[in-house]
Amino acid sequence: MTQKPRMAQASDGRFAPNIQLQHVKTGGFYRVVCLANIEADLAPAYVYESLQTHDFWIRPQAEMEDGRFVVVAKTN
């Protein structure tokens, strides 16, 4: 019997839901929605929203946490 893979939990990531981030290179502001899993390989990834355009984006956890984003505010 194959075990179900462990799914990403919010506590697994550096950035919790609703934290506001700034992209270092572009200066854009974003809000973290959740930590999810990419369907193809179940790798953890962040779902986040642009605070300027309200577009939603998905980025692998490793990229999101490599220094290209910094925390600017913690909201509820």
Locations of the language-model features?
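Mixed-charge, Lys/Arg-rich low-complexity intrinsically disordered regions
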Residues: 1-17
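Basic, alpha-helical terminal appendages of large translation-related enzymes
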Residues: 2-6, 45-46, 57, 73
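A short, compositionally biased
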Residues: 14-18, 41-44
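An N-terminal domain-cap segment
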Residues: 15-16, 27-29
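A short beta-strand micro-motif
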Residues: 19-24
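Short beta-strand-centered aromatic/proline hotspots
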Residues: 28-37
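Short solvent-exposed strand/turn elements
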Residues: 39-59
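Intrinsically disordered, low-complexity, charged/polar segments
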Residues: 55-76
